[in-house]
Amino acid sequence: MKKSFKYFRANPCGNITGFVVAPVYPGYRKAYTKCIIEQIDKDVEQVGFISPAYEGAPLRMDMMGGEFCANATRAYGLYSAGFYDTDGLVDIEVYVSGHEGTTDVIADVKNQKAYVAMDAPLAKKTVKVKGGDYKLIQLPGISHLIVEGQEDEKFVQDALEVLKKDYKDEAYGVIFFDKEKLEIVPFVYVEGSDTLFRESSCGSGTVATVNYLEDDIDGLDEDYKISIKNPAGELEVFVYEFEDGKKLCVGGEVELSEVEKKSIDIPQDVVASVIAEHDKIVEERKKQMAEEEQEKVVDESDLTDEELEIMRKKFGFD
């Protein structure tokens, strides 16, 4: 099945992200991502799906697995800011997967920079992996385990086994952190797509690292700035006070390509699988609705006078 759509590529600190600007049924997102990497751009690490508006700025952006991605969000925010007549920094609110409500992105279209505001951690917990204690920073949409030590892929698998079992989330990061050099190596696993990548950079992992270093973000002043080295470059983090309080903002430069029309060819067996899964979901939903309908208690106020009279005669109501 051949599908055509508008497409552009973003490079937020090496975390190469492809964007499909078209409505895409969620069941096809994994297939689109695989085909884009194989047929259009082998350097793409992840794909975001933008729901365009009839005119003006787009409506929202969803990642393939429904997770939250800070780098993709700030790239999407910069793209969205291009629809507004702005000069200099602008704070725009965007809707993205993995986060309830809006997310603030501070964008500078002229200088091609964007920073995403991150909510405070939902929790900080101590997790035991292979006899060692590590700090888990739980952010909305993704949880990051901070590991002060050298990169170790075997440890990543051990950690994910513990995290997936005991800490349910949409995505997990294992962040190897060199505290002296302020340098991280991020591994990210996405539950919805069952994918694990050694990321070129990770915005949420960078913020999780700062939350690991700093106990109280509210206690930091707005002069606070720090740069964390990622495999493909540095990400900047600073404190900014929004209407709902202080937040850490992470980002830097973002390269955006021109929007072009692209096509992919989705294998027929994949199409058949998606259709079968869709039909299964529809049938399960119909069954659920039927069961809910049977469980409903009849409320006389919902009946017409004629129906009420029949009920009274049939069951002897006064």
What feature does the model see in each segment?
Residues 1-112, 138, 143-278:
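A glycine-rich beta-to-alpha transition motif near the start of alpha/beta enzyme domains, typified by
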Residues 38-42, 165, 284, 291, ...:
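A structural signal for alpha-helix termini and helix-coil/disorder junctions
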Residues 111-120:
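Membrane helix-loop-helix hairpins that form the core translocation module of multi-pass transporters
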Residues 119-135, 154-162:
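Active-site glycine-rich loop that binds ribose-phosphate moieties when present
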Residues 125-127, 269, 279-280, 295-296, ...:
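Residue-level marker of intrinsically disordered, low-complexity segments enriched
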Residues 272, 276-302:
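Acidic, proline-/serine-/threonine-rich low-complexity intrinsically disordered repeat tracts
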Residues 301-318:
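Long, low-complexity, intrinsically disordered segments
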